[in-house]
Each structure stands twice: as structure tokens, then as C-alpha cells.
Amino acid sequence: MAIAFHTFLLQLLLFFFASFAEANDSRKTYLVQMKVGGHRYGSSSGHQELLGEVLDDDSTLADAFIYSYKESFTGFSASLTPRERQKLMRRREVLEVSRSRNLKLQTTRSWDFMNLTLKAERNPENESDLVVAVIDSGIWPYSELFGSDSPPPPGWENKCENITCNNKIVGARSYYPKKEKYKWVEEKSVIDVTGHGTHVASIVAGRKVEKAGYFGLAEGTMRGGVPNAKIAVYKTCWRVIRKNGREDSVCREDNILKAIDDAIADKVDIISYSQGFQFTPLQKDKVSWAFLRALKNGILTSAAAGNYANNGKFYYTVANGAPWVMTVAASLKDRIFETKLELEGEDKPIIVYDTINTFETQDSFYPLLNEKAPPESTRKRELIAERNGYSILSNYDEKDKGKDVFFEFAQINLLDEAIKEREKGAIVLGGKSYDFNESIKLQFPIASIFLDEQKKGKLWDYYKKDQSKERLAKIHKTEEIPREEGWVPTVAHLSSRGPNCDSFLANILKPDIAAPGLDIIAGWPENVKLSSDRPANDYRHLRFNIMSGTSMACPHATGLALYLKSFKRWSPSAIKSALMTTSSEMTDDDNEFAYGSGHLNATKVRDPGLVYETHYQDYIDYLCKLGYNTEKLRSHVGSDKIDCSKTEIDHDADLNYPTMTARVPLPLDTPFKKVFHRTVTNVNDGEFTYLREINYRGDKDFDEIIVDPPQLKFSELGETKTFTVTVTGISKRNWNKNRAFMTRNTWLTWTEKDGSRQVRSPIVIYSIKGPKACM
């Protein structure tokens, strides 16, 4: 009897422990969006009161409550069980309860390439009063790039966690997933353990450092776009180990919102945001709404467009596409890394551009050993891993040491053991499983080169030409060389493209602008190995590193915007307009959905002539005209004064934007007419006359474009003029076809009468080819 009772008691205890564990495991982080007005739960204490009313019996506020937001979001974040979430969703005060998403991070001649050289005129006193908010993976504060002699801006309150603020880093706070269960790879501090945040911050505002470089490559002076500006760090991305054992970066949406909350309260001058999520509808994109609140407070946001284009194949992938955000695509620089594989007896080497080899292989040629598959041999070999018919071998005979080894492979991480075994050798790589392009640079801790399928074939032809003798090869150290004469900026294949699938944003051209994002050398934490993800056996450390992506393009745009702000105390939209309308033309004429207005160019950015001003209320009116829900809009922006019910719905509503874009309906052979209304502001003293010019590319893409009036006359600074652009045509089958949409495009340029100023705006009319185009 006693045994049975003890068994029952044990089972009962196990049941309660299991129930408790299950309840904890079922908790997930949610964002609770509140309605505005009409209830008592609007404050932080009100949020906690509401949450306390719906908690399960065995839960406490300490278990559930995470953040209350003031500036960026109307509501709070909490760790909820499914039942608690359901209770909250039924409350009349609550608008929406949604999962906090995990967003993704998007990676010294680049400033010279944009014509912002060391000799460029600067305003150091004003520049040193500017603060950039870098919302990223933290910072390595001990880098020489992050020193400064000038004090923080007047009235600025230094807020630094775990580190001591200095005259360059004037803020450093961290926001980590408080309720999510992860195995942490790093300590909960602002110190950067991935290198991403350090790299980004140094591109924007790193101070001048002589003799910077990367193992002898691209040596020169490293500096940010605004080397005198201050940096406020808001760490939202962390390295963790997930349940499947994989190490990954976690950038939770609730933490990002809290970082934006604090950045707005701190009154920073600009936000640099190199994170994002492949296309998110505006109604669900809470981070974008937080950036609208930042704009209301005079803060421009520069954000990465995303790295989701898959070698230029995927459109409809642009991230951070709200019109109040400056969305930045990644471009190639005017110099390129070239690596040669020299084959003995051959006149021409094999040349690749997707490898960085930092090792000298002296002057000697080395035997080329084919290890595509286990050869029939008595030598002992161990098969490390095999995937889809590709293999990697180790435990080679000593006599094989120092030979070039040719591997076909399916996954880079399979190379780790091979690299460890042959740390003095060289590896030649090739395979069908990787579709590499100029956007990704492979590098390993031994002499190495990557060959794509075509160039691998050339090596095979050489290898098999005469098998009676040993084949010899030599990998040269990578060199940085200028591109061919006449080269103009090109969009990187990884950079995400428009158009925007969201019906509320269909008539906004995104990205806005392109900036250097490929092979960018910038600051790096000395405690972080150069290849933070792969291979596992790379333990090299440097003060600088090479990274690629829209993450690197974004801080270039941030830096140029701050540079302009150091001279002009303009509104966020005026600064954005100046960057867009003074940009340089790019190649791929019909691909504005890849690069927007063009490529950043500092030459004329301080004197754009005219700017397109778009104020906070303009965005509200625009969304109301498109039929946005009043209650949701009030909650998104945190104001009960908005009332869209009195606004007449107009699905052709226009925004005073520096670009002119419209989606016109199919079917084909249907006439269309689109009218754009624009207002420009004169930003110069004196009298000026601007003449309109339509820049057709080849055959005229439209039946007719009428600009009324054809000239604009200004007599004073700040004067505004309004004009209309009427575009008519027929949606024909011979339009340029780009994946799932068809487009026609041209440019409107307002040219000052003496030719000294040009204000360029692209005109893009497009149709999507079917309902699945945006899926």
C-alpha cells in the first residue's frame, strides 16, 4: 500500500513538473499592439496591469513581461503561453498580438569611389556634434578607429553599458532576448563578437587610420564617411546556439523596437540599420512604423535593402521598403580582387574574381593531386564526409604534403577537417553545388582558389591532357586591380530588388539608392577570427576585414547623409532627396528596381538645386487616400488625432517623392494614363530657371510624356513650385521583361539654365504578369 502511494505521489509530482516545463517551453515572445485612447492601459504600468489580468494561474509578471515602448511602438512585448495570447487577443484594448520575428543582418577606397575623398571640404565642428545610431551586433570599442579628441555634443547624455564611453562612442546599450531559451555563445554585453556591428560603425564614422589594409591588399588610409561624428551603439543581434546545435545570429524584433525607442529618446541625428527581413507587408512591419515615428522626430533612417536577390534572379525581395526609409542597394566598386591559377606550360592563367588568397606560394609550381573521389590505392585514407556524391579526404601520406589538392564539394563546412590536415598545402575548389558570383569572396587559412563549373572544366582539360607526367600549378596571391576603362557602377547580384508587392507601396520605387557594398575593408574586432562562420579552423585575427552585402552599402549612405547634414540643417526628406537626385547613372538601363535613383555621388550632393520635401503628415495623408484603416494607423503612429474616414479614397494617390513610379493593370494592349503631381523647393539664394528634359533611352518607351509647366522659375531661397508629369501609353507585349513584371522607364531631368545643376528623377511604369508574381 505504501509503495503504491509513493508511486502515485511520484507520478503526481512528475505530472506537475512536466506541466510546468511544458508551460515554460510553450512560452514565446510576442508584440502586443494596443489601440490608441479609450482605455486605461496606455502607460507602462497599464501594460503590466493588463498583462497581469490574462496570465495563467501559475505565471507571474516576472515570467512574462519584457518591454514597454514609448517612442517606437504602441504597446509592449511579453513572453506568452498560447492561452495567454488568446486572452489578450480577445481584449477590446488590444489591436494585434504577433510573434516577435528574428530579423537578419544584411555585409578603403569606397569613399573615394563616391568622390568623398580625404581632401573633400568638411565642417568638422558641426560634424562632431552629429550622432549616428548603429543598431547592430555591438562594437569593438578598443579599435583605434573609435577614438576622438572632440567632446560629445552639447546636452548629450552618455549611456554606456559594460564599457566606458569616450569622445567617439557616446552611447552603448544592449537588448537581448530575455525570455527566449538559447545557449549563449557570448556574454550579455555590447562587445561585438561577430564583427558585423564594428564593420558597419567604422564605415559610417571611423576616424582616420593610416596604413590600413588586409594582408597587404587595398592598403591605404581607412576612415569613415564622417570621421568626426559620434557613435551611439544599440546592440540587438547575438550569437547563440539553437536547439538543433547550429550557431546563429538572433536579432529579435522586440529588442530592435526597444533600441529604436531609446534612439528616438536620445535624439540621435540618423539611424543606420543593416538588418531586415525579406519583403514584409507594411501592416505587419512594426520596425518600419517605428522608423516613421523617428522621422516625426526629425531622424532619418538609412536601411539595407537585403541580400535576397539570389544572383540577381529574385525580384519582389526588397526589405525595409517603406517610403520614409532610405533603402540602400549594394553596388560593386571600381576596383576588383583578382586571383590567378597558373598552370605549367600554359600561356594563359585561369583568373577568378570570387576568391581572396592572402598567401604567397613562392615562385615554385606544385604537383596537382586529384582527390575528386577515393582512388584505388593501398595508401590509408579516411573519408571525412560525403554528400550527394562529393567527398572530402584526409590523412594523406606525408609525401603528398605541399601539393595542390583539387576538391569537389557540396558544403563548405566539409572542408574544415581537410584544411586542418593540410595546413601547409593549397586547395583548389570547384563544384556544381555552389553558384558563386562576385558577391561572395571565398577565403581560407591556407593558399586557396575557387573555380566555378566553367573554369573547373579548364583545369580538368589541362589535368587530363597528358596523364603520363605530373601536372603542376601555382596559386598567386590575390591582387586588387582597377576595372576596365569606361566601367560604370553596377548593382551586386546579391542585392534585393523591387518592385514592392504591398499594394500600399506599389507606386514607390525601391530601393532608393545604391552604394558600395562589395569587398569593403573596414574595422574588425581583434578578438574575432576573420572567418567568423567558416571554416572552423581559421584562427587569423586582424584589425580590419573584408565584408560584402547591403549591410555595408547602408552605412555608406548613412555617412553621406551625415556629411550633408554637417553643412545643411535640412529635413530628413530633403537630405534623402539630395542624395537621390544627384546620384550617378548605372549600367543595366532598365533595372531601376535594382538600384533606384542611381549610385551615390558626393560631388554635387551639397548643391542639389531643388529638393522634394515629404513631411510626416504627407505620409499619413497618402496612406489614408489609399484606404488604410484608421484604427490601425492610429496605433502604428501612436496618435488618436488621425481620421481617415473623412479622406476620399484614391488608389492612384501620389506622394511627393523624388522618383515617379506606377503599377498599371493588365491585360496587355490596354491604354494607360498616369499623372504625377510633384512640388520642388529651391535650396539656393538668387534667381534660377530650370528647364525640363526627358531622357529617353533608345526608342521612346511611352506614347507621350507631358511636363507642365515645362520650366520652373525661382526668385528666392525656400520658394516652392508645383508641376505635373502625364504619362500615356499602351501595355504592349514588347515591354522589357524582368522576371515576373514588365517595365517601361525613362528620366525627367530639371536642368538649371546655365547647366550647372541637374535634378534627375526616374519615371517607371510597370505591370506584374500575374497574381503569383508577388508570392
From Swiss-Prot:
One of its GO terms (molecular function) is serine-type endopeptidase activity. The keyword Cell inner membrane does not apply. Residues 110-606 form the Peptidase S8 domain. Its EC number is 3.4.21.-. Residues 24-106 form a propeptide. Transmembrane segments: none annotated. Keywords: Autocatalytic cleavage, Glycoprotein, Hydrolase, Protease, Secreted, Serine protease, Signal, Zymogen. Glycans are attached at N24, N115, N126, N162, N437, N601. InterPro entries: Peptidase_S8/S53_dom, Peptidase_S8/S53_dom_sf, Peptidase_S8_His-AS, Peptidase_S8_Ser-AS, Peptidase_S8_subtilisin-rel, S8pro/Inhibitor_I9, S8pro/Inhibitor_I9_sf, SBT. Residues 29-105 form the Inhibitor I9 domain. The keyword Protease applies. One of its GO terms (biological process) is proteolysis. Residues 365-459 form the PA domain. The C-terminal propeptide is autocleaved. Residues 1-23 form the signal peptide. The active site is at D136, H196, S551. Pfam families: fn3_6 (PF17766), Inhibitor_I9 (PF05922), Peptidase_S8 (PF00082). SUPFAM superfamilies: Subtilisin-like. Gene3D superfamilies: 2.60.40.2310, 3.50.30.30, Peptidase S8 propeptide/proteinase inhibitor I9, Peptidase S8/S53 domain. One of its GO terms (cellular component) is extracellular region. It is found in: Secreted. Belongs to the peptidase S8 family. This is Subtilisin-like protease SBT4.1. It comes from Arabidopsis thaliana.
